[in-house]
Amino acid sequence: MADRPIRVRYAPSPTGHLHIGNARTALFNYLFARHNNGTLVLRIEDTDTKRNVADGEKSQMENLHWLGIDWDEGPDKGGDFGPYRQSERKDIYDKLIKQLVDKGFAYESYRTEEELKADREAQKARHEMPHYEYEYEGMTDAEKADAIAAAKAKGLEPVIRFHIPMDKTYEWDDIVKGKISIDANTLGGDFVIQKRDGMPTYNFAVVVDDHMMQISHVLRGDDHIANTPKQLAIYDAFGWEPPIFGHMTLIINGATGKKLSKRDETVLQFIEQYRELGYLPDAMFNFITLLGWSPVGEDEIFTKKEFIKQFDPKRLSKSPARFDQKKLEWVNNQYIKAKQKTNPNELMSLSLANLIEDGKIHSDPDPKTIEWARQLISLYTDQMSYTAQISKLADIFFDKATDLTDDERKELADDNAKPVIEAFAKKIRALDTFDAYSIGGIVNEVKQETKVKGRKLYMPIRIAATLRMHGPQLAETIELMGRDQVLKNVDLVTGQL
């Protein structure tokens, strides 16, 4: 195994959008491949036709590309070990299943779903673990042949079951969990490797594909631990060398401590949703990488190259990874602030699209509006956790208040508030150049004239000018709001004092 080239795979089913957990699996395999100058294979496991959705494969690929994950072989790129869709490999599976049947490792099973259900109920009544009961137990070869002939005469379609060796322990050195041992007697008996419709099951197809595609390492979620002994049994039957396995811990909701489930609506769980909200791909790459993997040192922000250089599966956590929404927002904010410095046009484009989608700006804005939006976005960059947040953050420019809140009235109840506002309004009306620099100047003039400073100066001016107690830099906010709107706001406030 040590001499084998590093080849890993990400093998999604096209059953929907890219989930956070699956994105993490893809990302860790990508980092492992790139760190070792290895190969990443994208394989589409689409044998469960009932669960496949239209454009599911396309959606997976688009979101992987958006995250910055590229692969070396796959259905869109080809390679020496294709086809890379399981639905196109049925002839391969059929041939190998026949080999197992011919050698006695597998057999036709005609037990109906009703019979299997009755078996499970009887086992439950006996306080036994659910398991498949061998239907040909105690039969001679002739009796077995007669039973099969009778089933066929009834028009029953068989499944193919793999004969799991009992009283055997399957062990492997897991690169995440360490040594794992599972007793074959706990596996539920002989398991299906080919369904009645002729399609292979997951546990069979994945073994065949991993072997034929020369996969050296399998990094996947620890919900697959129970599948591993079944897969090892198939490797043994063929005499194939299995890959090295590594099973990553599950992801839990940091707020509830429960396993992250697709039914948990308190957390957005699909990459597509974060794209639509204006999360940046590099930020998502960074955050997801730290879900269950620890870098050297205390830093939390890394470039992709730094992650590739550091990545070692031995640093994958043995404890569940906590999905912390606030932490994700913090990480994305760091990238937004960096993007404002390195590529402000990209950030502008994303945020402008959100403003248009929310109906805050016309769908075909003129150059003056675009420049105004550019200044607005720059004003809120430090506060923005994701670009779709811009409409809510900047609501003072779009949602006009018509009355003061109780808290605002309390702030303006001070004897100094009215003279400060009146002095400010007078100077705003007379201001020749209405820009942030000049506005900052008249605020200082009001300070000198009224002898009021600090909160008692700035809070009345902010409330009067913007109808809000809080916001970004005051002078810049007033400039973007415009003289006419500011004076309307001032008149509204003074009318309520």
UniProtKB/Swiss-Prot annotation:
The keyword NAD appears for this protein: no
Extent of the signal sequence: none
Position of sequence motif 'KMSKS' region: 259-263
PROSITE patterns: AA_TRNA_LIGASE_I
GO molecular function, one term: glutamate-tRNA ligase activity
InterPro entries the UniProt entry points to: aa-tRNA-synth_I_cd-bd, aa-tRNA-synth_I_codon-bd_sub2, aa-tRNA-synth_I_CS, aa_tRNA-synth_I_cd-bd_sf, Glu-tRNA-ligase_bac/mito, Glu/Gln-tRNA-synth, Glu/Gln-tRNA-synth_Ib_cat-dom, GluQ/Sye
Example GO BP: glutamyl-tRNA aminoacylation
Binding site for ATP: K262
Localization terms from the record: Cytoplasm
Catalytic reaction equation(s): tRNA(Glu) + L-glutamate + ATP = L-glutamyl-tRNA(Glu) + AMP + diphosphate
SUPFAM superfamilies: An anticodon-binding domain of class I aminoacyl-tRNA synthetases, Nucleotidylyl transferase
Taxonomic superkingdom: Bacteria
Key words, A-Z: Aminoacyl-tRNA synthetase, ATP-binding, Cytoplasm, Ligase, Nucleotide-binding, Protein biosynthesis
CC per GO annotation: cytosol
E.C. no: 6.1.1.17
Motif placement: 'HIGH' region: 12-22
A Pfam family recorded for this sequence: Anticodon_2
PANTHER family on file: GLUTAMATE--TRNA LIGASE, GLUTAMATE--TRNA LIGASE, MITOCHONDRIAL-RELATED
NCBIfam families associated with the record: gltX_bact
Its biological purpose: Catalyzes the attachment of glutamate to tRNA(Glu) in a two-step reaction: glutamate is first activated by ATP to form Glu-AMP and then transferred to the acceptor end of tRNA(Glu).
Quaternary context: Monomer.
Protein name: Glutamate--tRNA ligase
Organism, as annotated: Lacticaseibacillus paracasei (strain ATCC 334 / BCRC 17002 / CCUG 31169 / CIP 107868 / KCTC 3260 / NRRL B-441)
Gene: gltX
